Structure formats: C-alpha cells, structure tokens
Regions:
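Right-hand nucleic-acid polymerase module
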Residues: 1-192, 202-324
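Cys/His-rich zinc-coordinating modules
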Residues: 198
Length: 324
C-alpha cells in the first residue's frame, strides 16, 4: 500500500514548532518544552546505542544536544523564539535537530510557494507518492528508488526539450516541486520500504493511472503511486509530510534508526526542481529574532529525569539588547 499523509507525532511536532503555523506565545512554551524533552530523551537513548557501537564521539554529541536551551520572550507582542542551543546536527539520529531542520525547510518553501502561486494563477499543488518493492537490503533499495526517480526526471527533461519527438510523461505536467525520500519497515513484509513524497505544481491534473504505468516501467517492480490535490490546510500538511522525513527516522527502533543513519548519511534525501529550485534554507537551527523589541531571556537546563528546568531569567531592554 502507498503511504498516505496522515497526522503523526512527527507532523504534530513540525506543525506546532513552526511559528507561522502554530501557537508561538508564552502559553505554548510548556508544550514546546515537552516536545523537546521527548526528543532529547530519544537522543540520549540513541547516544547509548552509539556508544555500544564503538562511536563515543558521536554519542557525546548526541548526549549534549539540547542539554541547554535559550528562549527569548518578546513580551510586548507575546512571541517566543528559540535563541540558542547546543545542536549536534545529526538530524537522522537526533529528533530535536530533525524538528528544527524541518521547520526551517517548511518556512522557506512555504514562503517561496506564496510567491510562485501569486505569480502563476491557476497553478495547483499535488501530493505524489512513489514506492518500490520492499527488500532486506536498504542500500540496494535506496539505489533502486533513486535510479527510478532519475529516469523519471530524465524523461520529463527530454519531453520538455523536444515535445514533438519525445513521449509525454505525467511528470512533465509539473512546473516545479520538491521531494524527500524516507525509509521504514513495511507493515506486512517487515522489510525495508523506501519511498518518496513529492509536491508537484501543475496546471493540468496528473493522472494516477498513467503515472502508475510509467513508474512500473521505470522501476520494473512497482506500480504503487498516489496522486492527490492539496489546498489550504491540506497543502501545509503535504509540505510537512515532505519535510518531516528526517524526524520519522526517530520513530524506528534504535537498531533500524542506526542502520538507516549509516546507510543514508551524506545521501541526497531532499531535492527540488523548476519553480521551487534554489530555495535558500538557513543553516541556523534557531528561530529568527524580532529586532528592536525588549524581551525576557529564559535559560533552560536539562536536569535528567526532571526534564528541562528554568535556570535563569533576565529582562533585556532595547539598549541592553544592542550591546549583546
């Protein structure tokens, strides 16, 4: 079966953490800390696992990630921003880094999407999911999926260059888009199930039936695809589905998460094309500050079983902020 977008702990985390799409005032901070606490506890378990795999340096980075957090509450407008933290940047292993990275991608691409849709009336977004047959070897299945996606991309490119000479493919209807690749265990097979979630921006409706036939020709082993239009809240959910790919690895058992990290690190798991090509995603995992506003600086320390505790709070006015 195809993986359909649905609510999950991963999507909840991204939706709640994105200040553009979730509550970001002081009242929401306890829930945010609870999400980060859950993420940090998982990272600590993964750190122990990494230590057992003979990776003490990596274990140390995972264990230190998120052990302190600095928030700024801009109380005149009731906005809370994550100002600083000690991130490990191992987003395939660390849920906190995956949450923050996903939020950055979500905001950057939604901002670009607003511009693209304003400039291209009638353009509509579609969520497209493609899969390959499950298998025991994750590396081999990943390569197989990537080969099929490259074949699909090349077929689109060939048609757009010479539509009179080349066969039309459904992917050619997309003027732009973005995709991510994720992997989990198949519910029925227990084997690795890599798949890609894609956003296509189209004027014409893509045909699921035609795409299924094309996809089977490119893969040789799968015709399972899903195509559905996305509007309003569903559109935000579709982009969340794409950008939560790294966070979903933390829902795997530790040994599977470790294997996926070892297999897929340094692989391109996210890419874009056409009207969504070249979106600038900031490397910084903290929130953008609100300039020229006074704030309360809140320093939270990790206290083990007790979770996060407020260790220090200080009020900063405009003049003090300029000196910091």
């Amino acid at each position: 079966m195809v993986d359909r977008p649905k609510e999950s702990p991963a999507s909840d985390s991204l939706l709640a953490d994105g200040s553009e799409h979730g509550a970001d005032g002081a009242a929401a901070l306890p829930d945010r800390l609870a999400r980060y606490e859950k993420a940090h506890r998982r990272a600590l378990r993964m750190a122990e696992y990494a230590e057992g795999q003979g990776e003490p340096q990596l274990a140390g980075k995972l264990g230190r990630c998120g052990h302190w957090l600095v928030f700024r509450h801009y109380y005149t407008v009731d906005k809370v921003r994550l100002h600083a933290a000690d991130f490990c940047r191992k987003h395939l292993l660390c849920p906190l880094c995956a949450i923050r990275r996903g939020v950055k991608y979500l905001k950057a691409y939604m901002d670009r999407l607003d511009v693209v849709l304003a400039q291209n009336p009638g353009l509509r977004a579609y969520m497209v999911t493609v899969t390959v047959k499950d298998g025991d070897d994750l590396a081999e299945r990943f390569r197989h999926l990537r080969r099929a996606m490259k074949a699909m991309t090349q077929a689109r490119r060939d048609y757009l260059k010479a539509p009179a000479q080349r066969q039309h493919v459904e992917f050619a209807k997309a003027l732009g888009g973005v995709h991510s690749i994720e992997a989990k265990r198949g519910a029925g097979s227990g084997q690795w199930h890599p798949h890609a979630h894609m956003i296509w921006l189209c004027h014409e409706v893509p045909s699921q039936a035609l795409l299924a036939r094309e996809w089977e020709a490119w893969t040789g082993d799968s015709f399972i695809v899903d195509v559905r239009p996305m509007d309003g809240a569903d559109l935000v959910g579709a982009f969340i589905e794409v950008f939560k790919y790294a966070l979903k690895f933390s829902e795997l058992p530790l040994d599977d998460n470790w294997q996926a990290f070892r297999t897929l690190s340094n692989k391109r798991l996210i890419d874009s094309f056409g009207l969504l090509r070249g979106v600038d995603v900031p490397d910084d995992l903290t929130d953008e500050p609100l300039d020229d506003l006074p704030f309360l600086e809140l320093f939270y320390q990790w206290l083990g079983r007790a979770g996060y505790s407020l260790a220090k709070a200080s009020r900063v006015d405009d003049a003090t902020a300029e000196a910091r």
